[in-house]
């Protein structure tokens, strides 16, 4: 945004959608080519078509079945602020991933409820540096459970499973903040000097081959019509 029309970049990619909105509000995007928009489900792109999602990550509750029976799983992300969850779950609060989850709580529950949830979280959870560290701690039985993105466990399972073999995933439902899906996005900058190539790249990364490559590396996907 600070570079504005002077940016030397052709394509803007970001991990979380709020950054896409900032650039879009500054009117720095060129419209995405119609052929690219057709590859992305309408739920994963704004109606005006200035940018598209290139990946989606689902918030999940990872737990160690040896320490936490399924009957005791939380019904909602908000439950984790309750006293019965003190010392029983972990998260990585410093990263953009968890900040996006908090933003979902704010959007769905409001400022007062979010503040109370954060106070309860502070009392109850254990902080880790990164989602991988949370997964490893749950797997090792150091803590009962944690809040991460799905692809950390999927990625480990696709390799050796060494850091996830003692874990399972629980998905929150019914418009719960814990059912939050974070979008990585991409758009062509209006200042690009190579717009044709930039549009071609965006079409590839949202297409079958680009999505297959992302799925193989990161277990991330976006919605494709049909």
Can you annotate each of these PLM segments?
Residues 1-2, 6-143:
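Extracytoplasmic ligand-binding site segments that recognize negatively charged/polar headgroups
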Residues 16-17, 94, 148-151, 218-219:
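Short, well-ordered beta-to-alpha junction loops that form the rim of enzyme active sites
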Residues 39-43, 57, 117-121, 126-128, ...:
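Periplasmic-binding protein-like
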Residues 61, 179-181, 195:
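Binding-cleft/active-site segments that stabilize strongly anionic ligands or cofactors
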Residues 184-226:
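Mature extracytoplasmic/periplasmic domains
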